[in-house]
Design a protein with these regions (language model features):
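Conserved catalytic core of the tyrosine transesterase superfamily
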Residues: 1-223
Length: 223
């Protein structure tokens, strides 16, 4: 067992990380620690900066306020033109994304059989795994009201969310509608960037962590 920070050992350990982001995190974290302890004990080696190259800076995500989410849902409920089902469809979709942290792809792939008394069964997620996402009683009630009107429709698809033509909603349609909702809700740009749909997922994650100590367990179930 090594007593001092060793650059070669750090590089080997960081290289074993499952992703490039985690590799950089491991390397930079130990590197900062080494800078601190090296002042008192020079036998701690100082790893060279950016050994794995300069990490690409990610855009800082927007965290929506509760009021902004309310305004998005209200704007959805007031959608006009097209299918008269559109307002309830998008109000329910936005509410569900905000309440569960689902990816938009996961929400759009939901089928009747995925809505269970225990929550939403998310099949073959981004990492090809399935998980059960619990629903708060208010979210379950809202989804139930939507399904009460959706199920009787004599359509060929059993997807939960459908477009004006009775087909599963496409990504492009959702993003166009969301941009429209964000403008109607008067949500401002942030650091030059317009509001994004995926930031509802970031918002859910942050709110869940703020609800500690139960937050970490809750976010794990949803993500």
């Amino acid at each position: 067992q090594q007593q001092y920070v060793c650059t070669a050992t750090l590089i080997d350990w960081a290289s074993r990380a499952p992703s490039s982001a985690q590799r950089h995190t491991r390397y930079q974290t130990v590197g900062r620690f080494a800078e601190h302890v090296h002042l008192e004990e020079p036998r701690h080696e100082l790893p060279p900066p950016n050994h794995f190259g300069q990490r690409k800076t990610r855009r800082v995500p927007r965290i929506y306020t509760a009021l902004e989410i309310d305004h998005l849902v209200l704007a959805a409920a007031q959608l006009s033109a097209g299918d008269p089902r559109r307002p309830q469809t998008y109000a329910t979709l936005i509410s569900l994304l905000a309440a569960t942290g689902l990816r938009i792809s996961e929400a759009l792939h939901l089928r009747y059989g995925d809505v269970t008394p225990d929550g939403l069964l998310i099949r073959k997620t981004k990492f090809q795994k399935s998980r059960l996402v619990p629903l708060h009683e208010t979210a379950a009630a809202g989804l139930g009201q939507y399904l009460a009107q959706r199920r009787p429709m004599p359509l060929a698809t059993d997807h939960v969310f459908i477009d004006d033509n009775g087909q599963p909603i496409g990504y492009g349609t959702v993003y166009r509608i969301f941009a429209r909702l964000a403008r109607a809700a008067e949500i401002p740009t942030l650091r030059g960037h317009r509001p994004r749909l995926h930031e509802l997922r970031h918002t859910f994650a942050v709110r869940a962590l703020q609800a500690a100590p139960a937050g970490r367990q809750r976010i794990g179930q949803h993500m």
